[in-house]
Curated annotation (Swiss-Prot):
EC numbers for this chain: 7.1.2.2
Stretches assigned to coiled coil: none
Catalytic function, reaction form: ATP + H2O + 4 H(+)(in) = ADP + phosphate + 5 H(+)(out)
UniProt similarity note: Belongs to the ATPase alpha/beta chains family.
Name under which the protein is recorded: ATP synthase subunit alpha
Biological classification of the source: Bacteria, Bacillati, Bacillota, Clostridia, Eubacteriales
């Protein structure tokens, strides 16, 4: 092989020309302590609060405490693989999650990584988990209904698109069931649903995913899961990750429903992290900024103005109480942040009244303006009658001889309570709710025995769906009741009653 000197010199010249003298400067620190999802890192003097840090083995962390001589950071992954003395690099970025259409139908962890065994998620869009909530000028007041399919909610505590409505109650009172029913009811309504499971058993999350899949709801849903077996940092960031995924759709003019199940466990995880980071504890050992933990999350739910595409994100946070104590720290915080609350009671649940909603103390502060007119026309009277019934029922326990009007109100109230009962996974469209509640409010059920009310309702709805489908269609399109529609509804009720009572 002959090598000519001029050839060698030209190669050397090329190499000299290509030489790049740029030096990559990487800010590196050293792990001085690690454990329980927390690491303390020496160095990294220029690290920012909330910055993503890279540990060996592809594990990432997030800077939380910027102290004089070290940084306290939470580890987003297996902290057991990190050792003292390991090198940590700054990334110059903040924590982001993948977003977009590709996420729909998938089950992901708090970092947006798939955990459903269906392969990787093909998306090139990312959003930071922390984002500033839209300001007043970028919002529009809530005016469109978000139907849950549950009579007691849609009539008495209605929810609008862009609202934050808290679901609160003890364990085993059906909080998740209300949320899942609401997701199932969004089928065909062009609403993308996100279910964020925080600190739940993996088997419970699997059960919810199966239920959603069985009802065809995974076609428009994303499940973000941070189970009880995962480290506290994952439980802490999961709601923010779910919110970022929802914001991608909201800012593109779409409608989103997001459920945080539940924020009590997120607050407990944040308390754990804060105490491990040696932050000063406050009431119930929670850190001083636990209110901000939830307010900055829930304020991101909004109904956007037409200039920003008129998208919306409706949030249904769930809070678990202990023995019905809604005056505890976290429940009062979230009640004050949200636009209303749905109280679920153990006593009602055990008495067979499901969904176990206490309609007396449940409120919706903005949803009323989102109700369709037909529902407003029947629900106003329903709310009043139920309030009178509760008052009289408490009074009637002490005396037996009641006057006719009192007896009539008690009779009607019993039937109204019965008609508000509903089976799980059977959400009802709004026009059917209107005709059923119309029958109760106008006294058509007063002479039907209480134990026959549910079978009458089934018979009545069967007739409405088959022979009176045009009447339901009219209510759906006109969205209001007039004298003509009232007469048609009353005629239908009377016909069904005659056949039912025989």
């Amino acid at each position: 092989m002959n090598l000519r000197p001029e050839e060698i010199s030209s190669i050397i010249k090329q190499q000299i020309e290509r030489y790049d003298s740029a030096v990559e400067v990487v800010d590196v620190g050293t792990v001085i302590q690690v454990g329980d999802g927390i690491a303390r890192v020496h160095g990294l003097e220029k690290a920012m609060s909330g910055e993503l840090l890279e540990f060996p083995g592809g594990i990432y962390g997030m800077a939380m405490n910027l102290e004089e001589d070290n940084i306290g950071c939470i580890i987003l992954g297996k902290f057991t693989e990190i050792r003292e003395g390991d090198q940590v690099k700054r990334t110059g970025r903040i924590v982001e999650v993948p977003v977009g259409e590709a996420m729909i139908g998938r089950v992901v962890n708090a970092l947006g990584q798939p955990i459903d065994g269906k392969g990787e998620i093909k998306t090139d869009k990312f959003r930071p988990i922390e984002n500033i909530a839209p300001g007043v000028v970028y919002r529009k007041s809530v005016h469109e209904p978000l139907q849950t399919g549950l009579k007691s909610i849609d009539a008495i505590v209605p929810i609008g698109r862009g609202q934050r409505e808290l679901i609160i109650g003890d364990r085993q009172t059906g909080k998740t069931a209300v949320a899942v029913d609401t997701i199932i009811n969004q089928k065909g309504k062009d609403v993308i649903c996100i279910y964020v499971a925080v600190g739940q058993k993996a088997s419970t999350v699997a059960g919810v995913v199966k239920t959603l899949a069985d009802h065809g709801a995974m076609d428009y849903s994303i499940v973000v899961s941070a189970t009880a077996s995962e480290p506290a940092p994952m439980l802490y960031i999961a709601p923010y990750s779910g919110c970022a995924m929802g914001e991608e759709f909201m800012y593109n003019g779409k409608h989103v429903l997001i459920i945080y199940d539940d924020l009590t466990k997120q607050a407990a995880a944040y308390r754990e992290l804060s105490l491990l980071l040696k932050r000063p504890p406050g009431r119930e050992a929670y850190p001083g900024d636990v209110f901000y933990l939830h307010s900055r999350l829930l304020e991101r739910a909004a109904k956007l103005s037409p200039d920003l595409g008129s998208g919306s994100m409706t949030a249904l946070p769930i809070i678990e109480t202990q023995a019905g104590d809604v005056s505890a720290y976290i429940p009062t915080n979230v009640i004050s942040i949200t636009d209303g609350q749905i109280f679920l009671e153990t006593d009602l649940f055990n008495a067979g009244f499901r969904p176990a909603i206490n309609v007396g103390i449940s409120v919706s502060r903005v949803g009323g303006s989102a109700q369709i007119k037909a529902m407003k026309q029947v629900a106003g009277q329903l709310r009043l009658d139920l309030a009178q019934y509760r008052e009289l029922a408490a009074f009637a326990q002490f005396g037996s001889d009641l006057d006719k009007i009192t007896q009539m109100r008690l009779t009607r109230g019993e039937r109204m309570m019965e008609i508000l009962k509903q089976k799980q996974y059977e959400p009802m469209v709004v026009e059917e709710q209107v005709v059923v509640l119309y029958a109760a409010v106008k006294g058509f059920l007063d002479d039907i025995p209480v134990d026959k009310i549910k079978s009458f309702e089934e018979e009545y709805l069967r007739t409405m769906r088959t022979t009176k489908a045009d009447l339901l269609a009219k209510i759906r399109t006109e969205k209001a009741l007039n004298d003509e529609l009232n007469a048609e509804i009353e005629k239908a009720i009377t016909e069904v009653k005659e056949g039912f009572l025989g």
